[in-house]
A protein has these predicted regions:
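C-terminal transmembrane helices and immediately adjacent loops/tails
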Residues: 1-164
């Protein structure tokens, strides 16, 4: 599951159409590392947002029915949030309300395949023993998707704030 849900979006981002706004950016200094403090802080903030949503999901599930449901919510949220995060990785600029959000058919396909696999793991009876999760009903699955999706607009908003 992890190989498909991480690898396919990464490959799809490799064929992302170029950003028409990129030439408006100042070039980085020739000796400047790609891994700048600013870039690493963006990674840390994105991770903090996704981690926070995963913890909220865990606590929600834990309060509903204990540790197994909590860990199932956390697993589903983290896997799906990483798929949603692929859209955050398209650009340094916010893309959520632009046509660029949907311009990479490979990323959309990778997202749909990954989401279908994760949904199957969380809802198909019999798979709970293989993946050590609790089978979710529709309302529970909705909670997982909501927690995972929430990271997307939050990170997009942070990108908008950084650019302003």
């Amino acid at each position: 599951i992890n190989l498909l849900t991480d690898s396919l979006p990464a490959i799809a981002l490799g064929v992302e159409p170029s950003d028409s706004e990129v030439m408006k950016d100042k070039p980085r200094a020739a000796k400047e590392s790609i891994l700048t403090g600013k870039f690493l802080s963006k990674i840390a903030v994105d991770g903090l947002v996704i981690g926070t949503m995963t913890m909220i999901a865990f606590l929600t599930g834990y309060r509903q029915n204990g540790a197994l449901l909590g860990s199932t919510y956390a697993f589903g949220t983290l896997c799906l949030a990483r798929l949603f995060h692929g859209f955050n990785c398209k650009s340094d600029r916010p893309v959520i309300f632009t046509k660029r959000f949907f311009n990479n058919k490979w990323l959309l396909g990778a997202f749909m395949l990954g989401a279908a696999l994760i949904t199957a793991v969380l809802t198909v009876p019999g798979l709970e023993t293989v993946f050590k999760v609790e089978t979710l009903n529709l309302a529970q699955l909705g909670t997982v998707y909501l927690c995972a999706f929430a990271s997307l607009p939050i990170i997009q908003l942070l990108k908008w704030v950084r650019k302003e």
